[in-house]
């Protein structure tokens, strides 16, 4: 019998909107309770509310230990300087037990740090979630898929279930640790997993890579000159426990070394690895860093992109490709089809999903199930989307294993300190008159091409170039991108730019002292490593996407000079006054505000009035620019599509709603599409 990963041979796929957590947790109702403060409450860092909200005072004596504990059991909501807000959810408790915490561990530690008596409804909620969580594990071991039960009672519940019994393989065995174990058929793994959720015993997925002798080992270690930081080590310890590899997601800020975490995971497992990226540029950068940080040979690292279709010849190796290459369902070239057949026929010990927040999008959902693999590691800086589909990661990949605090890493010098500035640009009278009478798409482009915004962008570029800094300018709209870049004489990269040309422009930006400004479309949002950049100017964006705001900020967080005394990077957002841009700008900033960043609003830049700006100063030039927008085709008015197809669709619906064309709930699912857990949660929030 040919072995294969559980995602290749399954016959039943998970349905959208399916409950991902046990019924007990999803049906729990938080009951209001009076807060009862302890006598020694001033010395304790936590205030625990009856609705699952936990407030952390960062200035108390035990704040550091309490923070480490909360990261393990709760979801961070907001983390400004002195007071943090967390929320306990079924997902966060699922993640807690997956890394070894027990019910009593959670309750006793929560009580020790709490200012008040932990509400009874929270105690019941934790018990309901955790008493059955972590009691079953799906383990790939010795060429078989085994379900391990923690106790005889749990074993009897599982084997006594009619549906699970039907899906079992012949025979029941005990492993060396005397756990109760039974084997399940390879083609039924997903059905068993879903059934365990339905009967209140969600499984933790693990890969016993040390005892996997069937898969050839990969000769790969970290180079002696490479050292990992403390927070990277902590995140990896969450993944590798009990001498096995857990599937899950690690959340680190942009520039904090997510790639090195992934490479270290490869070196630990030492089995064939497949890495999924968002673009061809990130494929090249992943390959460069794998070879720079590890001892693996170049022949063992292959690429599968539109321009390179390689297959390593060794028994074990690394394949780096893009989500799009795997998700493509159209006709392929003979060469690409040959690589796809080889890829599908190969067993992968580890699948790394870079920028994992894109995986739940409609075009990528099938990627995870297209390849035979035994362990999944998701990497991202922003576990947030505008369409609620981030919830699906718990089903597609696994629980969140670790999430770092952006401000902590900034204070330690691991990522740069940032000054965030929102610059309000007056609309010229002629542009604003047309803005009021146009359809939503053309209004949006008019606000982007506002001559005052053009002049502000030119002023900021000249100012920071004079300081010897490298500048990135972002625009989602391609018409604006080309117009700005060509008018200011700067290079630009967008969707149609070929892979070879992209790499050439990026190299010039990094190494040529004469090329100090680069214009990027959405293709630069993620996975492009430009540590030379220390200033970012955003002239247009993707509606209210919090994820995109954080990803773009991340392009300058890894600045090489971040540890220089007094050094900081600059993040400018240019907004046309009295337009929809002002509404969306506030929405976009929310994630970064929750991470402790502050935005300074400026209506007049210092020195701007005294500077001889060169672009669109005359009325004739401004009218010509206005005519360009008014005569632009519908295609030119569209923003460039991103990988987050579903998120983009949600925000377009929102734009139409605000324009009066459609009556929909913006960026959300219908009630029936939500997981049961979240239907109840949203109902409570509405009340």
Swiss-Prot record:
Matches recorded under SMART domains: DEXDc (SM00487), HELICc (SM00490)
**Quick one: a GO biological-process term for this protein?**
nucleotide-excision repair
Catalytic activity from the UniProt record: Couples ATP hydrolysis with the unwinding of duplex DNA by translocating in the 3'-5' direction; ATP + H2O = ADP + phosphate + H(+)
Domain Helicase C-terminal: where?
Answer: 455-609
UniProtKB keywords: ATP-binding, DNA damage, DNA repair, DNA-binding, Helicase, Hydrolase, Isomerase, Nucleotide-binding, Nucleus, Transcription, Transcription regulation
Function of the protein: ATP-dependent 3'-5' DNA helicase/translocase; binds dsDNA rather than ssDNA, unzipping it in a translocase rather than classical helicase activity. Component of the general transcription and DNA repair factor IIH (TFIIH) core complex. When complexed to CDK-activating kinase (CAK), involved in RNA transcription by RNA polymerase II. Also involved in transcription-coupled nucleotide excision repair (NER) of damaged DNA. In NER, TFIIH acts by opening DNA around the lesion to allow the excision of the damaged oligonucleotide and its replacement by a new DNA fragment.
This chain belongs to the protein called General transcription and DNA repair factor IIH helicase/translocase subunit XPB
Source species: Antonospora locustae
Q: Which gene encodes it?
A: SSL2
């Amino acid at each position: 019998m040919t072995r294969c990963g559980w995602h290749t041979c399954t016959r039943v796929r998970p349905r959208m909107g399916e409950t991902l957590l046990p019924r007990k947790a999803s049906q729990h109702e938080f009951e209001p309770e009076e807060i009862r403060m302890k006598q020694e409450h001033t010395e304790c860092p936590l205030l625990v509310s009856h609705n699952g909200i936990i407030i952390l005072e960062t200035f108390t004596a035990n704040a550091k230990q309490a923070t480490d504990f909360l990261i393990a059991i709760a979801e961070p909501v907001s983390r400004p300087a002195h007071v943090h807000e967390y929320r306990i959810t079924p997902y966060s408790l699922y993640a807690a037990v997956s890394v070894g915490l027990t019910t009593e561990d959670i309750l006793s530690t929560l009580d020790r740090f709490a200012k008040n008596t932990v509400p009874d409804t929270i105690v019941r909620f934790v018990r309901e979630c955790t008493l059955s969580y972590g009691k079953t594990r799906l383990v790939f071991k010795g060429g078989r898929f085994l379900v391990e039960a923690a106790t005889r009672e749990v074993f009897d519940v599982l084997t006594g279930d009619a549906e699970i019994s039907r899906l079992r393989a012949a025979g029941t065995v005990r492993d060396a640790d005397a756990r109760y174990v039974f084997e399940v058929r390879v083609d039924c793994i997903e059905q068993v997993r879903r059934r365990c959720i339905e009967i209140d015993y969600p499984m933790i997925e693990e890969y016993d890579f040390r005892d996997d002798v069937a898969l050839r080992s990969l000769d790969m270690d970290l180079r002696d000159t490479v050292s990992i930081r403390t927070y990277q080590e902590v995140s990896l310890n969450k993944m590798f426990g009990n001498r096995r590899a857990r599937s899950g997601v690690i959340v680190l800020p942009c520039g904090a070394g997510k790639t090195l975490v992934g490479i270290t995971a490869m070196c630990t497992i030492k089995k064939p690895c497949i890495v999924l990226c968002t673009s061809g540029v990130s494929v090249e950068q992943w390959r460069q860093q794998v070879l720079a940080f590890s001892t693996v040979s170049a022949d063992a690292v292959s690429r599968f992109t539109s321009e390179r279709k390689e297959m390593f010849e060794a028994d074990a190796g690394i394949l780096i490709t893009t989500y799009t290459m795997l998700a493509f369902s159209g006709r392929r070239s003979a060469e690409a089809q040959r690589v796809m057949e080889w890829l599908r026929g190969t067993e992968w010990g580890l699948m790394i999903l870079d920028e994992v927040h894109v995986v739940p999008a409609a075009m990528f959902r099938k990627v995870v199930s297209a390849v035979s693999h035994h362990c999944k590691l998701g990497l991202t800086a922003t576990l947030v989307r505008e369409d609620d589909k981030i919830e699906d990661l718990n089903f597609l990949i696994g629980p969140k294993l670790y999430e770092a605090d952006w401000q902590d890493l900034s204070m330690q010098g691991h990522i740069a300190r940032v000054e965030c500035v929102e610059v309000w640009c007056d609309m010229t009278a002629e542009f604003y008159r047309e803005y009021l009478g146009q359809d939503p798409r053309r209004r949006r482009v008019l606000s982007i091409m506002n001559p005052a915004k053009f002049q502000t962008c030119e002023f900021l570029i000249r100012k920071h170039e004079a300081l010897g800094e490298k500048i990135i300018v972002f625009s989602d709209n391609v018409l604006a991108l080309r117009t700005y870049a060509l008018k200011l004489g700067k290079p630009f990269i967008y969707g149609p730019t070929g892979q070879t040309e992209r790499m050439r422009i990026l190299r010039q930006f990094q190494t040529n002292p004469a090329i100090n400004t680069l214009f990027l479309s959405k293709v630069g949002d993620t996975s492009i490593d430009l540590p030379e950049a220390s200033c970012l100017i955003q002239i247009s964006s993707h509606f209210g996407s919090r994820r995109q705001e954080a990803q773009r900020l991340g392009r300058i967080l890894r600045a090489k000079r971040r540890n220089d005394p007094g050094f900081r990077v600059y993040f400018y957002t240019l907004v046309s006054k009295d337009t929809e841009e002002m509404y969306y700008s506030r929405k976009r900033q929310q994630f970064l505000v929750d991470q402790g960043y502050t935005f300074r609003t400026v209506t007049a830049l210092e020195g701007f009035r005294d500077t001889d700006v060169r672009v669109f100063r005359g009325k004739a030039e401004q009218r010509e620019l206005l005519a360009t927008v008014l005569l632009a085709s519908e295609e030119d008015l569209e923003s460039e599509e991103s990988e987050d197809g579903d998120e983009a669709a949600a925000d377009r619906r929102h734009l139409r709603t605000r324009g009066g064309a459609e009556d929909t709930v913006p960026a959300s699912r219908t009630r029936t599409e939500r997981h049961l857990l979240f239907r109840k949660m949203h109902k409570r929030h509405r009340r």
